[in-house]
Amino acid sequence: MNTVSVVQFLAVGCAVFVLYGRGVFAAEGVKKAGQHKDAELCLGSDGLGHRLDEFWYNDDMCQRFLCFKDDEGIMYEQIANCPIAIAEGDCTLKPGTKGHYPDCCPAVECPPEDQKKRKFKRKCFLVNILTTLLTKLVKNLKKNQQ
């Protein structure tokens, strides 16, 4: 399984996890990156060159980006967006703060008796972090095998 397949699998897994957990729908994806004039850089969605394996942000859209190469040398751009938050029952929707993703994302706040929804939100955030870390780990393992 190549890096892109692993990332896509985890992103879909997170989306399914969130979908069935009620209240929040994940929004993350991977697409082929454009070719920058400097072969060492990735051409991001913003039209700028970015170093591989380094995050950059669009604070206006509350997005996080990451470029990486798969084992065939093809560059991909991972885009993380805010999940769609839906407040149900006694829960309320709290706007995100200014700053980088994920702090700028809206959040569902529930009364103390509804702790399950809070735990669920943390789990999905951890899945997003693990997806990013796993992508880097797979790349490093493949480099070490060569």
From Swiss-Prot:
Pfam families the UniProt entry points to: SVWC
Main location: secreted
UniProt PTM: Contains 4 disulfide bonds.
GO cellular component: extracellular region
Annotated coiled-coil segments of the chain: none
Expressed in which tissues: Expressed by the venom gland.
Origin superkingdom: Eukaryota
GO MF, one example: toxin activity
Keyword line: Disulfide bond, Secreted, Signal, Toxin
Protein's cellular compartments: Secreted
First and last residue of the signal peptide: 1-26
Family statement: Belongs to the scoloptoxin-16 family.
Protein name in the entry: U-scoloptoxin(16)-Er1a
